[in-house]
């Protein structure tokens, strides 16, 4: 659901971008053919003692990759804290609740925006940061030749039915 907003940020900066997501998203496999994504890192978003381990894992990624901008499309604090610890000058996020302590952007959502759904929050977030959104609908690019390799189970003749839930 965040794909249109990720693409808009890529187009805004005229560069391919890196993503950091939970491993359970399987993004390295599912999103590998999207041309506006450079590379995908996995990081957990856990609580308790693991919270700080995850922050320092993010910091290591930020230090290694030397990003100029970190965009966060959710209310989470970990990437903002890690970016701040890494000295990143442009930390841009919705700024909901405590997150605004860690971001550098002065344009963030207000507390009433917390009641919007995630897509509406992201759309408003882009708008207040002057990022043009060309298409609100997510789309995937799939290299079908690559998909055929090692996926014989998907190449079944006849009807196939898929059911997806979140």
Feature map (PLM): residue ranges:
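Catalytic machinery of carbohydrate-active enzymes
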Residues: 1-166
